[in-house]
């Protein structure tokens, strides 16, 4: 089964909790605080594995949760950092934020990595909060929650050359003739329902990867006939080989087929219409093929490179392979995907973690309670040990320093009003 798109949920590990502890040793009457920090939570990392070809593994497991860091211990011993969760993906995997569709990473090279969900920082032990005014603090910090994100994985095959055309024009037969690939071949439409790759060697020793893509139909650029899934794999190819049934054996007009497929390539975007293209006039062993080819050449002109072949009888196959190899040599230094990504503002390196901003919003619930939300305040809430009075007082000071108290007053909050943050409720006190 070929799986080229899947949506999964990632949860990075929470940081381990810091601990409140004191140094208690004989002959050391005032040992002071000795609580260690918690360990860092595991991040979720994607890594390219050249041995993989599909996203099949993610079809059966859609949720991945990384481990949390170990808690701190006494004697200022810090908790162990959790081992990162590394998920292997095939070359050509694009990772997007499922909600915003922002491209987080484009993984194309063996061993390339991207941190997509960052593990939480370990909570600080009480020894970290010691000051001259408070030399023995009796509170510590919980670990920071790990990031949680839903992402879409898209696989775009890494092939040098893509075979495109209507169903049953002979693409699979051509691939089977020029490589050792064994695609499914049949006398009916859409025999090929998944992309097939084959390594092709020319008689003069050059080689390239050829992809046989499922047949396109009119409206493919708008998703008709799974067109989006199929056209996605053309994006990374350097050369497009447009296969046409020049005999018209299916009752179609070769010229109309040519125009329709090129229109779909242009409509899809990604500048596919600008890729170097070779037109393969296939099925030249059948009746009417020669006459149709002459009419076709008259209509498209001399600027279109046309190679007449018969994949069935293997006529002119070597000439086609030489033409493809020459075209690849001509465009070997051109990175079409880079140009497309720059036009779209895509970062192809990796996802960079952006720290939370100290912004917040205040809304009202139906029961008139004030609801404070925002990444920074919610992060502080999760990292506060509300079983410790000193920790609660520290949280209140943090709210004041962020300007939340003043903002609540401006919204009309009075003494005794209820304030909610995540699952917690507080009384507003003047």
UniProtKB/Swiss-Prot annotation:
Which keywords does this Swiss-Prot/TrEMBL entry list? Cytoplasm, GTP-binding, Hydrolase, Magnesium, Metal-binding, Nucleotide-binding
**CDD domains xref list:** Obg (cd01898)
Q: Where does GTP bind?
A: 165-172, 190-194, 212-215, 282-285, 310-312
Cellular component terms per the entry's GO annotation: cytoplasm
Matching InterPro entries? G_OBG, GTP-bd, GTP-bd_Obg/CgtA, GTP-bd_prot_GTP1/OBG_C_sf, GTP1-OBG_CS, GTP1_OBG_dom, GTP1_OBG_dom_sf, OBG_GTPase
According to the UniProt record, where is the region Disordered? 118-144
Q: What class of enzyme is it?
A: hydrolase
* One Pfam family it belongs to: DUF1967
From the Swiss-Prot or TrEMBL record, state where the protein is found. Answer: Cytoplasm
Positions with a binding annotation for Mg(2+): 172, 192
**Which superkingdom heads the taxonomic lineage of this protein's source?**
Bacteria
Query: Which cofactors are named for this entry?
Result: Mg(2+)
Q: Which GO terms describe its molecular function?
A: GTP binding; GTPase activity; magnesium ion binding
TM annotation in the entry: none
- Major location (coarse): cytoplasm
Similarity comment = Belongs to the TRAFAC class OBG-HflX-like GTPase superfamily. OBG GTPase family.
Q: What does this protein do?
A: An essential GTPase which binds GTP, GDP and possibly (p)ppGpp with moderate affinity, with high nucleotide exchange rates and a fairly low GTP hydrolysis rate. Plays a role in control of the cell cycle, stress response, ribosome biogenesis and in those bacteria that undergo differentiation, in morphogenesis control.
Stored HAMAP family:
GTPase_Obg
Question: What name does the UniProt record give this protein?
Answer: GTPase Obg
This protein's gene is called obg
């Amino acid at each position: 089964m070929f799986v080229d798109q899947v949506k999964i949920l990632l949860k990075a590990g929470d940081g381990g909790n810091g601990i409140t502890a004191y140094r208690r040793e004989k002959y050391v009457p005032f040992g002071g605080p000795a609580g260690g920090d918690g360990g860092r939570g595991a991040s979720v990392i994607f890594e390219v594995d050249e041995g993989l070809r599909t996203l099949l593994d993610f079809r059966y497991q859609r949720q991945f949760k990384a481990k949390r860091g170990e808690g701190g211990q006494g004697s200022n011993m810090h908790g162990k950092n959790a081992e990162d969760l590394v998920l292997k993906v095939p070359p050509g995997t694009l990772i997007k934020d499922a909600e915003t569709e922002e491209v987080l990473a484009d993984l194309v090279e063996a061993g390339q990595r991207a941190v997509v969900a960052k593990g939480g920082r370990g909570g600080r032990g009480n020894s970290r909060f010691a000051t001259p005014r408070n030399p023995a603090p009796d509170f510590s910090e919980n670990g920071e929650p790990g990031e949680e994100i839903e992402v879409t994985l898209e696989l775009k095959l890494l092939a040098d050359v893509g075979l495109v055309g209507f169903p049953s024009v002979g693409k699979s037969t051509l691939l089977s003739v020029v490589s050792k690939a064994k695609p499914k071949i049949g006398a009916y439409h859409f025999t090929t329902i998944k992309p097939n790759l084959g390594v092709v060697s020319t008689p003069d020793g050059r080689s390239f990867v050829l992809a046989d893509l499922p047949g396109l139909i009119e409206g493919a650029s708008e998703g008709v006939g799974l067109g989006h899934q199929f056209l996605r794999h053309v994006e990374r190819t350097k050369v497009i080989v447009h296969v046409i049934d020049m005999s018209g054996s299916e009752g179609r007009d070769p010229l109309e087929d040519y125009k329709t497929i090129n229109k779909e390539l242009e409509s899809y975007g990604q500048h596919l219409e600008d890729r170097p293209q070779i037109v393969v006039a296939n099925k030249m062993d059948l009746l009417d093929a020669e006459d149709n080819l002459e009419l076709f050449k008259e209509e498209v002109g001399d600027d279109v490179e046309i190679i007449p072949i018969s994949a069935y009888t293997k006529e002119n196959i070597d000439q086609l392979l030489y033409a493809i190899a020459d075209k690849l040599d001509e465009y070997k230094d051109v990175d079409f995907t880079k140009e497309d990504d720059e036009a779209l503002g895509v970062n192809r390196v990796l996802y960079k973690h952006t720290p939370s901003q100290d912004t917040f919003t205040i809304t009202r619930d139906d029961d008139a309670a004030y609801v404070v939300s925002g990444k920074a305040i919610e992060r502080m809430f999760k990292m506060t040990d509300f079983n410790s009075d000193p920790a609660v007082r520290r949280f209140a000071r943090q709210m004041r320093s962020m300007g939340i108290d003043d903002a609540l007053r401006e919204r009309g909050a009075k003494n005794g009003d209820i304030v909610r943050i995540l699952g917690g409720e507080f009384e507003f006190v003047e």
